[in-house]
């Protein structure tokens, strides 16, 4: 009897460790955005899109990033980067409990992930623009299932700036 209880507890502990790791984006994904699934990307047409509104903002403004698909997805990993390069810069903030900001090696909350066993066909993320002049895009990896994922899906370009002066500036 003790052996059976010990075996059940060992299996439960093993399952708990696997479940606690679920929902985490591995740090290796930050560089190439590839999920650690060991499979090739699908050759089927991309069923997902990223739209942004508005596409021209000033620092402090909010951009709605809308992720949608003709098929449901179980995960998305989103990074904000320069429009002319793959450079990563700070990104999105949380909207739902299953959403989480991700810390990449070069910064804090500069990527976003959603991972769930409950599939979605849309997800909205509000992003607050920094006080800078730049052109950026969002790049995403979509995971439909363990063996089906698409990498490098890009949003339309967003123009940031020009820099605004403070509204409450003191006149000299």
UniProtKB/Swiss-Prot annotation:
Q: Does the keyword RNA-binding apply?
A: no
Induction is noted as:
Its synthesis is positively regulated by juvenile hormone.
The GO annotation for biological process reads: defense response to bacterium; defense response to protozoan; innate immune response
Protein keywords: Antibiotic, Antimicrobial, Immunity, Innate immunity, Secreted, Signal
Keyword check for Secreted: yes
GO CC, any one term: membrane
Localisation per UniProt entry: Secreted
Q: Where is the signal peptide?
A: 1-21
Domain Reelin as annotated: residue spans: 22-172
Predominant cellular place of this UniProt entry's protein: secreted
| Reported tissue expression | In adults, in hemolymph.
Q: PANTHER family, per this entry? A: CELL WALL INTEGRITY AND STRESS RESPONSE COMPONENT 4-LIKE-RELATED, CYTOCHROME B561/FERRIC REDUCTASE TRANSMEMBRANE
> What is this protein's function per UniProt?
May have antimicrobial activity.
Family assignment? Belongs to the insect defense protein family.
Which protein are we looking at?
Answer: Putative defense protein
Organism of origin is Locusta migratoria (Migratory locust)
